[in-house]
Amino acid sequence: MVVERLQTNLDQQLELLESLKTVVAQEQQLLCSGRIQGIVLQGVTEQKSSILATLAYLDQTRLTTEKNINIQAPYSNVPALAERWQRILELAEGLRYGNLHNGLLLQQHIEHNTQALAVLNTRHGQSLYGPDGHAKGASLLGRKIGI
């Protein structure tokens, strides 16, 4: 039956939202650690993006199913669906706040790194490394002496 398909869809969305909650918590843990591990953070970000893409697909499927059977969230006439929908809304709201918090943490890291780079650039005047990533020939301490 079509209502059962909708119920399955909502159950799948709930599972994904729970997974996303775990991923957002991992992301927060990484952002709160003293030093961010870029590769680990990138993996978490990719995992988050994958879950969000699947959620978007499931939600589009939900909307199509709703249209086909002429029903609409919050499903007040179908208690089993209404309960799932309410849980989805609660999880989504919590995730919104978690994601906002993580965005603020990330912004703080970016600002800190920008300030650190500004200090390094003003103290040294020139970059220590050339475009190829190798150390430049000029010495910052004075003259070069060959032996």
Curated annotation (Swiss-Prot):
Cellular compartments annotated: Cytoplasm
Keyword Hydrolase part of the UniProt annotation: no
InterPro entries, per the entry: FlgN-like (IPR007809), FlgN-like_sf (IPR036679)
Pfam families (alphabetical): FlgN (PF05130)
Keywords, alphabetical: Bacterial flagellum biogenesis, Cytoplasm
Cellular component GO terms held in the UniProt record: cytoplasm
Its biological purpose: Required for the efficient initiation of filament assembly.
Similarity field: Belongs to the FlgN family.
Protein name: Flagella synthesis protein FlgN
Organism: Yersinia enterocolitica serotype O:8 / biotype 1B (strain NCTC 13174 / 8081)
Gene that encodes it: flgN
